[in-house]
Swiss-Prot record:
Name of this chain's protein: Elongation factor G
Domain tr-type G: 8-282
Residues annotated for GTP binding in this entry: 17-24, 81-85, 135-138
Keyword Chaperone: no
Chain's role: Catalyzes the GTP-dependent ribosomal translocation step during translation elongation. During this step, the ribosome changes from the pre-translocational (PRE) to the post-translocational (POST) state as the newly formed A-site-bound peptidyl-tRNA and P-site-bound deacylated tRNA move to the P and E sites, respectively. Catalyzes the coordinated movement of the two tRNA molecules, the mRNA and conformational changes in the ribosome.
Localization per Swiss-Prot or TrEMBL: Cytoplasm
Organism lineage: Bacteria, Bacillati, Mycoplasmatota, Mycoplasmoidales, Metamycoplasmataceae
Any one Gene Ontology cellular component term annotated for this protein: cytoplasm
Entry's family note: Belongs to the TRAFAC class translation factor GTPase superfamily. Classic translation factor GTPase family. EF-G/EF-2 subfamily.
Pfam families named among the record's database cross-references: EFG_C, EFG_III, EFG_IV, GTP_EFTU, GTP_EFTU_D2
Length: 692
């Protein structure tokens, strides 16, 4: 079967934004205008097609990323609509990993908001080219200029308008295209019928000034535009578009368009900008991978061996587990065998599905640049590389996800529900790399851990709805960490003689702090003092002990362990003995190096009317908060950014609502770990019945 759309005509894009900026509404309009859907569904009344989960419809927010495909001006646009709430930022992270471009949606009144910063930073990490859509231009306080300024100052983004709005707030009626110097007025009907009009006299001078700024901004990316600009010659539209595209593909220039998706103004022009300026798979650098521990580059071509990255798992009630994947090279047909190089396992693709939110269409094959879902992959999880069965066994760069910072205990309301609870948690954990579930070894309780209270609320709600499990939920708990603050050499020796074969393991390990670098194990054994086959076992023994901690039962982080000496017994030494010896050494380290408790510190952004400034700041201070930034928005609202321990943030939503008469909002996400004050740490250790 030949390719229906050339690879140069593909656009793999994500729609990303702060919560309530109008991201899903914008996506719905894109689908309507491209003919993908024939009736517009609204987020606020639960009618959005992209928000298909019951929880999304009830709460009016996006929780999980949803994929679909649309067509516009001869281009195939694969779209992923991502959540705007910080608790579900993993959905943005894994989507951006497999996308070539993105549309950042801003609220024209608020400009850049806290979660905008987070998703923008994620896109920058993956070098994803972006355009900016300033939405809600009809809203009170809407200001295109201030929104662009917020991108420049808060995101350090080189944002440049390619449109000038005509009117704002209730007077917003359309825009001037600064590239073609044409004015468009909209009737506000669902079809978004735009009428080209002569540029109104009152906007002509401003449009000429803004076009000059645009030309100046792109000239540094295109020599021909620069020469024509210096000679004060007219720049052809096609050349200017080409220069804007070239600049955008560098991820150092961000074209800005405007509109109001809900009122059906400006969305078609935004889709045009996606087609004109965002990259095809041929425009982005080759993907980095590894083959036999050497770096290789995977280029986008159907002629190359098949390679793809699994970026999402979803449990479908009708077809079972779906594995979403992005094809980076080659062709794959349904029924084929593939090789999971991450897990070193062969698997068979059953069916291949083209997804539209939660509906699906079966297809025969996928090619380079496609995003699809597979049925039948049992061992493949998020971040795994799959290649053709006979292909070179490369491994694409892995995804890295944040660790959970909050946990709760669950208890099924009946013993009969225990098995269903276990199955449900297993399936939900397979879907979400930032969700963990485990059994507390001391209490026997089932523990769930995630990125925030809303994250865990949704997990519990899904257990009830999708798996029919009623559970009792404990109070949220903070996920503390442990680490050491000094360097020491420690001996671990395990000898057991009780008849029959004995046990012998003996190690000397240097433990030292390893700030912000996780766990590092170094083997410095020389002369065969410990046989090579036991080295990995010693490392595993340390990792297992780190998971349960040595101070208060919390996982250890940022530790370097150097194995430098030890001994073995030709008869009695075993893997188990060395694992125990390593664990004993780490346990003994508590007595010779200072072990401390670390608490998660959250980045908290609060937006509220300025008359409540004193109350809000005073409350944050009482919560051990440290003010990082303080500003006043263009609409007069106060915005405070602070670092606050997670343990102090429980119940904050209720307190903020009370302080600001319901007019304050906040967002928070994990920022870093910090040493817990001694008096608080002692109390935590005491509660867990573990002596310091």
């Amino acid at each position: 079967m030949s390719r229906e759309y050339d690879l140069k005509d593909y656009r793999n894009i994500g729609i990303m934004a702060h919560i309530d900026a109008g991201k899903t509404t914008t996506t719905e309009r894109i689908l309507f205008h491209t003919g993908k859907i024939h009736k517009i569904g609204e987020t606020h009344d639960g009618g959005s097609q992209m928000d298909f989960m019951a929880q999304e419809k009830e709460r009016g927010i996006t929780i999980t990323s949803a994929a679909t495909t649309a067509f516009w001006r001869g281009k195939r646009i694969n779209i992923i609509d991502t959540p705007g709430h910080v608790d579900f930022t993993v959905e943005v992270e894994r989507s951006l990993r497999v996308l070539d471009g993105a549309v950042a949606v801003l609220d024209a009144q608020s400009g850049v908001e806290p979660q905008t910063e987070t998703v923008w930073r994620q896109a920058t990490n993956y070098k994803v080219p972006r355009i900016v859509f300033v939405n809600k231009m009809d809203k009170a306080g809407a200001n295109l200029e201030e929104s662009i300024k917020s991108v420049k100052t808060r995101l350090n983004g080189n944002a440049v308008a390619i449109q000038l709005n005509m009117g704002s707030e209730s007077d917003y009626r359309g825009h001037i295209d600064l590239v073609e110097m044409k004015a468009w007025e909209f009737d506000g009907k669902p079809e978004e019928n735009g009428k080209e009009i002569e540029i109104p006299a009152e906007y002509l001078e401003a449009a000429q000034i803004e076009r000059s700024k645009l030309i100046e901004a792109v000239s540094s990316f295109d020599d021909e535009v620069m020469m024509l600009a210096l000679e004060e010659q007219e720049i052809p539209v096609d050349l200017l578009k080409s220069a804007i595209r070239k600049a955008t593909l560098t991820s150092e220039f961000f074209p800005v368009v405007c509109g109001t998706a809900f009122k059906n103004k400006g969305v078609k022009a935004m889709i045009d900008a996606v087609v004109d300026y965002l990259p095809s798979p041929l425009d982005v650098p080759a993907i980095k991978g590894y083959f036999q521990e050497k770096e290789v580059l995977v280029t986008a071509s159907d002629e190359n061996d098949f390679s793809a990255l699994a970026f999402k798992i979803m449990n479908d009630p009708f077809v079972g587990s779906l594995t979403f994947f992005r094809v980076y090279s080659g062709i794959l047909s349904k029924g084929s065998y593939v090789y999971n190089t991450t897990k070193d396992k062969k698997e068979r693709i059953g069916r291949i599905l083209q997804m539209h939110a939660n509906s699906r269409e079966e297809i025969d094959e996928v090619r380079t640049g496609d995003i699809a879902a597979a049925v039948g992959l049992k061992d493949t999880t998020t971040g795994d590389t799959i290649v053709g069965d006979k292909s070179k066994h490369i491994i694409l760069e892995k995804m890295v996800f944040p660790e959970p910072v909050i946990s709760q205990a669950l208890e099924p309301e009946s013993k009969a529900a225990t098995e269903k609870l276990s199955l449900g948690l297993q399936k939900l954990a397979a879907e979400d790399p930032t969700f963990r579930t485990f059994t507390d070894t001391e209490t026997g309780q089932t523990i769930i851990a995630g990125m925030g209270e809303l994250h865990l609320d949704i997990i519990v709600d899904r257990l009830r709805r999708e798996f029919g499990v009623q559970v009792k939920v404990g109070a949220p708990q903070v996920s503390y960490r442990e680490t050491i603050t000094a360097k020491a050499d420690v001996e671990g020796k395990y000898i057991k003689q009780s008849g029959g074969k004995g046990q012998y393991g003996h190690v000397w390990i240097t433990f030292e702090p390893n700030p912000n670098n996780g766990f590092e194990f170094v083997d410095k054994i020389v002369g065969g003092k410990i046989p090579k086959e036991y080295i990995k076992t010693i490392q595993k023994g340390l990792e297992e002990k780190m998971a349960s901690g040595i101070l208060a039962g919390y996982p250890m982080i940022d530790l370097k362990a150097t194995l430098f000496d030890g001994s073995y017994h030709e008869v009695d030494s075993s893997e188990m003995a060395y694992k125990i010896a390593a664990s004993m050494a780490l346990t003994k380290a508590k007595d010779v190096v200072k072990t401390v408790l670390l608490e998660p510190i959250m980045d908290v952004s609060v937006v509220f009317p300025k008359e409540y400034y004193g109350d809000v700041v005073g409350d944050l201070s009482r919560r051990r908060g440290q003010i990082i930034n303080d500003e006043t928005r263009s609409d007069g609202a106060s915005v405070i950014k602070s670092h606050v321990p997670l343990s102090e943030m429980f119940g904050y939503a209720t307190d903020l609502r009370s302080m600001t008469k319901g007019r304050g909002t906040y967002q928070m996400h994990f920022d870093h770990y910090e040493r817990t004050p001694r008096n608080i740490a002692d109390e935590i250790i005491k509660k867990r019945n573990i002596k310091n």
